[in-house]
């Protein structure tokens, strides 16, 4: 019986772990990848999606296409039981729990932005980690530009056209342009 490798997360780490393990171990293992979406997001292109220089479809690729020899599940991870080597996921329309057994587990779920540490961020900040984030930022900027276009008051126009980028990482720098 083949060794079962279960990978949680289909971002850069999960994607490249799956690809590398398949290349290295070939048919000696059965690899399954669980991800919230059934596509891979090339995050370095999200600022271009937000800016409108490329469409959203150019920043994503179906995981099943990229990882042809690996089973892909679009699902939410609920829990991990290391004692029984079982991961519980919710998938499909009815979101019934499914239990997946593994011999080896790769946890590559990525990170989330915690905006709760600074007053006002949860209400006013936008993040840049997902395709929806890029779309939301684009819509917000367009809304602010349209607001500035119709107002006659210089202070309102200035406020509508003032944006603050927090973070000097790749996404922050690229979002600034």
Residue spans of the language-model regions?
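FAD-binding core/adjacent interface of flavoenzyme oxidoreductases
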Residues: 1-3, 71-164
């Amino acid at each position: 019986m083949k060794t079962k490798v279960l990978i949680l997360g289909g971002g850069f780490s999960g994607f490249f772990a799956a690809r590398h393990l398949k290349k290295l171990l070939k048919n000696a293992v059965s690899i399954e990848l669980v991800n919230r979406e059934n596509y891979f997001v090339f995050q370095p292109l999200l600022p271009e999606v937000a800016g409108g220089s490329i469409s959203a479809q150019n920043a994503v690729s179906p995981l099943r296409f990229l990882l042809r020899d690996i089973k892909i599940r679009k699902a939410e991870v609920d829990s991990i039981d290391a004692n029984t080597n079982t991961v519980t996921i919710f998938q499909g329309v009815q979101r019934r729990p499914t239990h997946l057994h593994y011999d080896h587990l790769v946890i590559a779920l990525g990170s989330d932005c915690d905006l709760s540490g600074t007053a006002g961020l949860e209400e006013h900040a936008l993040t840049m980690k997902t395709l929806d984030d890029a779309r939301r930022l684009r819509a917000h900027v367009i809304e602010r530009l349209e607001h500035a276009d119709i107002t006659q008051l210089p202070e309102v126009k200035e406020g509508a056209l003032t944006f603050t980028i927090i973070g000097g990482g790749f996404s922050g720098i690229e979002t600034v342009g």
